[in-house]
Amino acid sequence: MWGRVATGTVSFTTTTTQEVHMSVTCLSHPCEADPSVDIPAVDLRPLEPGDSCAVSEVFAGLGAHSRRLRFLTAKPRLTAGDLRQLTAVDHHDHVAILAVSTAQDRPIGVARFVRDPDRPDSADVAVAVVDAWQGRGVGTMLTSALVRRALEVGVRRFTMAMSPHNEAAVRLLHRAPGEIERLALDDETAEFALVLGDPVPRPWLRRLLARPVR
């Protein structure tokens, strides 16, 4: 998925109606590049408060296993409250970016961060890509866009909770730009903080998550 460089622009309209243009660049990692894999034709755009159908469609594209990895519990459906929470975006404290297949004009992934009110430079982050599009670079594109927007609005630290068995999340974290702080690790959940910055090689990450927890 890192065999090409994808560029584009995502425009955010804030609550003060100021339009912000954010360039998106997905850079290849020298250890991960695979020239035989093309980054697909995907448009990125900000998720809007009225995009509950798009959020529902991405959720519907996740199998039971993917849902458990994303939500860390069995999640057969999204409730009305879930949808309200997931679409309560303001492009500053709650930012979400939607990936849409250009050919099919259908949502295929979403990445978001929600700022910590007690620590304004920190935000919780989550990424979901429908099963049919996993492993094709969509998560990487979404994460790159999310990092750029975070830096624009003063977020310097991402926190995340994930299953140690979530290979896609491990790959994204392995290539993420910045320094990783390990917060907690047990059989079910791994919690990390990512201080945003330049990419840092971290071969220890896979070894850490693969080892038995005592």
Predicted regions and their residues:
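Short, Lys/Arg-enriched N-terminal segments with co-localized hydrophobic residues
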Residues: R4-H21
